Amino acid sequence: MPTKITAIYENPKSPEAFEAGHGEQIVLAKAIPGVQRVESAKVWPKEDGSPAPAYRVLDLHFTDYDAAAKAVTSDEASAFVGKAFELATGGVRLLFVDVEEV
């Protein structure tokens, strides 16, 4: 089954600083061995002005779980994760996700 690693970034202390470093985060993600596609998405703000449940999502797509599991042992993945935690002043969650085609 296709697998993706999803990074869910909580609301950062400084959105401007996060955005300034996000391009580098994407470059690091694309360098991870076995990554087929990288998708970045920004969470829409709530209409009432209250904080959104998250700030950004970054998806790294792989052919299957084994490819994703192997990829996370690479130096490139270490660099990506290091940058993720550096940027994520509000926190970040990293998930392995089984993609279900519907």
Protein language model annotation of sequence segments:
Residues 1-102:
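Macromolecular interaction modules
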